[in-house]
């Protein structure tokens, strides 16, 4: 076992996937958002469980992520959420990925690639209802559909939008976005096979109007709630723990500083322990002098600045080299959640989990 590793509890993932599926009506299909390596949890492992639990598809951010899943043997529909550039299109076509297009995408290039491949490309129509990121504005949908008539190898498979404030307590802005989405849908050739999707994690929990016929939960698959201000919550389990081990202990004498810049000075003689994880592993430097870890079931505060590959904590006299350190997860009666870590780092759980790229993953069933 490596000195530092990330433990992914597959049973927790399965639990969350079951809870989400049970929360939605049977007539609403569900895909698993597994972009960014399933928010750091392992895309292949997460998608395998999702399909076993009745999910019908996967969503990724980029064409290369979808290609990796195809190469791993997955045959389910794979939606790409980000717009493709011409250099992405041959891979997307070859791997049968469902790519999004709006009026900025090079449809001539896409049509040419499809024609050579003798394939019809299924595409999604992203609608910009207020996120102002990608997509066609509702009033421009008729023109886009008219434009598509000139491309016989490109077929509109469905449409989606993204709510910017669905995780807020007040839903007025999200509902206005759904009004705009309804306007866009009214122009489209909707039949029983046309996919309509607007329910992100917060929408899945809180906004039934957003469910349509395909929900796309993301963060809630992995345990965190979309936000701490939402009225409703699901019974979710955190699937990720981060584990390391003490490599060094020492006495820091009164008046001595520790770490780069000497930002922490001992007020009295104290014991410190060194943990071999740093910001290169994704443990945010903003946790310097603020974050905590668990050693022997006790909370130990980070002292000094987090280094590239290590950081130091204050600890009691019982701590020894080799002792287990929990950065996220449970130890004894104590627990540090990703929500606590992200709040301390002044960011969101998504970023904390996605940033932990260098730490090896160990998959367990607990």
What are these regions (language model features)?
Residues 1-10, 14, 65, 84-86, ...:
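Active-site anion/phosphate-binding pocket segments in diverse small-molecule metabolic enzymes
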Residues 4-7, 12-15, 28-187, 191-197, ...:
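Active-site-proximal beta-alpha core segment in soluble small-molecule metabolic enzymes
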Residues 18, 146, 350:
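Active-site phosphate/pyrophosphate- and oxyanion-stabilizing loops and adjacent acidic/basic residues
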Residues 23:
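Conserved PLP-enzyme active-site core in the AAT-like
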């Amino acid at each position: 076992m490596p000195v530092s590793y990330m433990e992914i509890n597959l049973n927790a993932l399965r639990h969350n996937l079951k809870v989400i599926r049970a929360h939605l009506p049977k007539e609403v299909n569900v895909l698993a958002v597994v972009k960014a390596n399933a928010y750091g949890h392992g895309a292949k492992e997460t998608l395998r469980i999702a399909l076993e639990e009745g999910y019908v598809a996967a969503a990724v951010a980029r064409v290369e992520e979808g290609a990796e899943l195809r190469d791993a043997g997955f045959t389910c529909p794979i939606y790409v959420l980000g717009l493709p550039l011409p250099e992405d299109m041959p891979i997307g076509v070859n791997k049968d990925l469902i790519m999004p297009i709006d009026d900025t995408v090079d449809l001539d290039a896409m049509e040419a690639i499809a024609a050579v491949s003798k394939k019809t490309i299924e595409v999604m129509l992203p609608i910009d209802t207020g996120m102002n990121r990608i997509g066609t504005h509702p009033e421009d949908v008729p023109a886009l559909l008219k434009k598509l008539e000139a491309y016989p190898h490109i077929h509109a498979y469905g449409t989606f939008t993204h709510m910017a404030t669905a995780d807020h307590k007040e839903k007025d802005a999200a509902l206005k976005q759904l009004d705009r989405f309804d306007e866009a849908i009214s122009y489209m050739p909707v039949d029983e096979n046309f996919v309509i999707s607007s329910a992100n994690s917060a929408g899945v929990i809180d906004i039934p109007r957003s469910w349509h016929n395909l929900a796309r939960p993301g963060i809630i698959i992995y345990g965190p709630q979309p936000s701490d201000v939402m009225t409703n919550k699901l019974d979710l389990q955190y699937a990720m723990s981060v584990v390391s081990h003490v490599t060094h202990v020492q006495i820091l004498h009164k008046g001595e500083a520790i770490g780069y810049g000497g930002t922490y000075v001992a007020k009295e003689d104290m014991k410190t322990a060194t943990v071999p994880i740093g910001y290169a592993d994704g443990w945010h430097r903003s946790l310097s002098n603020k974050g905590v870890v668990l050693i022997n079931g006790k909370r130990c505060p980070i002292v000094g600045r987090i280094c590239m590959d290590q950081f130091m904590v204050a600890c009691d006299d019982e701590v020894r080299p080799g002792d287990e350190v929990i950065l996220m997860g449970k130890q004894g009666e104590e627990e540090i959640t990703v929500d606590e870590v992200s709040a301390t780092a002044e960011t969101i759980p998504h970023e904390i989990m996605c940033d932990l790229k260098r730490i090896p993953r160990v998959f367990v069933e607990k």
